[in-house]
Amino acid sequence: MLTVPGLCWLCRMPLALSHWGICSVCARAVRQRVSLCPQCGLPAAHPSLPCGRCLQKPPPWQRLVSVSDYTPPLSLLVHQLKFTRRSEIAAALARLLLQEVLMARRSTGLQLPDRIVSVPLWSRRHWRRGFNQSDLLCQPLAHWLGCAWDSQTITRVRATATQHHLSARLRKRNLKNAFRLELPVQGLHMVIVDDVVTTGSTVAEIAQLLLRNGAATVQVWCLCRTL
């Protein structure tokens, strides 16, 4: 997807604020329109009550906030973020996520975090890519919300197989004991930020780690929640 300075990247109309990248009309258009469970982020009958899945077997986090399903046009921008390290794309996507967070706070009293954490990459993968796309989202979010962020709160201590083609059961096994907590989180309200949540195995492993070490609550914020 070509990004043109001064024009909305999606509709190509002039931007009132050129550094935003996405106009307000398109920002509203990319938002998820179906009713979603506030806990797992999957389709549900009521957007303010946990779904039947979460009542029977809740995930280890309390809330999940997402912008959209992993579909165009948002998926195209997420792909560019993941492989090009363009700060203007990161800021624009972080702003979309911020808008979802603030709307959830107004409508449901969403708890704002004391600290946000990114999903870490294995050190060798981080070195090859040169950056962590989750870090690029965390930086502006922490600044706008006035909360703490440290990219070293959680580290990935071993390499894991690529998750894309694994079943949910194999994903869970693949990630077991893959992360280590480096900073104390006792009593803190924590948020895990990622670009895409598919089965939730990665963020579930991190959420369990945070809760075992005394975090008061854990939320997941992501750009795309695969439905």
Curated annotation (Swiss-Prot):
Could be involved in gluconate metabolism. PANTHER family: DNA UTILIZATION PROTEIN YHGH. It comes from the Bacteria. Pfam families: Pribosyltran (PF00156). Belongs to the ComF/GntX family. Signal peptide: none annotated. This is DNA utilization protein YhgH. Disulfide bonds: none annotated. Coiled coil: none annotated. InterPro entries: ComF/GntX_DNA_util-trans (IPR051910), Competence_ComF (IPR005222), PRibTrfase_dom (IPR000836), PRTase-like (IPR029057). The gene is gntX.
